[in-house]
Amino acid sequence: MTATVYTFTDKPATVTHTHTASGKPTRTEMYTYSYNHADRLLKVEHTLGGTKITLADYAYDNLGRLQSKSLHGSATNKLTYAYNVRGWLTGISGTKFTQNLYYNTGNGTARYNGSISSMTWKAGNESTVRGYKFTYDGLDRLLNATYGETAGINANTDRFSENVTAYDKNGNIKTLQRYGQTAASGYGLIDNLTFTLAGNLLNRVDDAAAASAYGGGFEFKDGVKQANEYTYDSNGNLTKDLNKGISTITYNVLNLPNMVTFSDGSTIAYTYGADGTKLKTVHKTGSTTTTTDYCGNVVYENGVQKLLLTDEGYVTLSDSKYHYYLKDHQGNNRVVINQSGTVEETNHYYPFGGVFASSGNVQPYKYNGKELDAKKGLNWYDYGARHYDAALGRFTTVDPSAENYYSTSPFTYCLNNPLNYIDPLGTDTVDVKDVDWNKFDPKKDVVALDEVAVSVPNALTKVGTRALEPISGFWGYVGYYLLDIGSTYHSEQTRFTYKVGTDGVITGVAPMVGTPPLPGFAKTSNLNTIRGLWSLTKQGSSKVMKHPIRGLFYKSKSDGLWWVKDQTKHGGSFYKVYKETNKGLEWHKDADKYGNFIINKHKSDVGIFIPWKELSK
């Protein structure tokens, strides 16, 4: 049971959880939240068993950006954050974790489009500074992640490099090379993979690498040599993975796995709520059965309360000790410390999410903060709507928002740019620069509103500001709105209202009352009209047409203009906008990702006119 008390500005002041289970002790916990005058979170306190502690203290700079975070009320457990003039995160520094991000500076090839060109980090009790240099192709897909050590990323190079040497025309990885630890003091090529596909479906993977990862560490396991090592059902769900020894996978109506059966008789069974929330997993291997129950933020193992997940980490219920995550720019759990600041786990990640052989295994929440199920060599990350196989850089099932990503395979991870994007719930791709992952909790910061779900403002970083890329439903790629200070935004399609604080930061969502002044667009409560991007999907448009190369064109209900996602994004363009004529569609303007027309931008002859004969329903 959960009880919430709100402030006068609709922010949670206290949240009380009462956990009950038959035959188990009742546990009551309470979160207390404190805010500044701009409704920014200043402090989170946690009360368990009558004892109150400070989970985290937050401080902000003059632009409202997170400046520092102190864990467990200790300055020793403090992280500070640095930004460039564009507001992009450039550094995280603390005694147990440090990270530096470089865009157009540093040791890599300069990038001016916001993609990270190189990064360095130092984690836990290690003295080694590690790093990657990144190169991308013309579609901003990752090609090479070249590993090195020291601040110059020029020592012990290639020890943990990861390179995609070819993509197909749909964006599926065709060949991939991965380096790693092969012996106590040896390093080399551990994966040299060739993917065989039928369209977007994976048929087989061949590994030409001679060496294996040291100590059974992360790598692709080439278990068989057959023509069809992977099979799928009619919904595009993976039903067999012979390389992992999986003989069958069955699914429920939500395309979530019910049962994974291995060839040796071992099984993994899943139980979900009606909304797809995972409630239970049962792992059976031989005579050993491990049952994990997820009851809110309490995790039971074999009927015993094991973990209580908090805003900043977890509590081990056997001893009531607090443990904290130190996260990088993507929300990856890099270091786990206890309440005294002692390092308990250190994790290093390949770009596509695999963990180095030297990483720890104290707790299962790793890449993007997602639970890694490594039992029986499954090695899947649970993203909620889908599972992700980091060894292959692919999801195991089709993207639920596949109609909005017409130009790429529905199995790809983050448009093949895993350094600069993340997928919070397995349903959409989000630029990491738009979200403060140190404050984002997918269970608390995402609220379902009928057919859509949006991130609430706690996770937003920028003043002026925008909603997070849509998590699910019919918003498609859009979901960004420019809002005036002190205003509210009404949406007819989604039936809710954004409330905006005095600094322009969204402060809450609430059900929409009444009829918006202009359906499909936005209007602030103080009558200052703003342009709201309508849904680039069938539900949000009056007509949809398909082009064999450019994808889906959507006709606006309000002004009759046709919108299509710009696949090249040259000059900051996110959308091509066309006017309708008798003979076809004539280019009108380019628009940025907020829906604003780009002034004084000229169009080449390519795609300036689309005849009707090239479009189909």
Residue positions per predicted region:
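Residue-level markers of secondary-structure register and packing in elongated scaffolds
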Residues: 1-16, 24-38, 42-43, 51-70, ...
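Active-site or metal-binding loop neighborhoods of secreted/extracellular toxin and effector enzymes
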Residues: 579-617
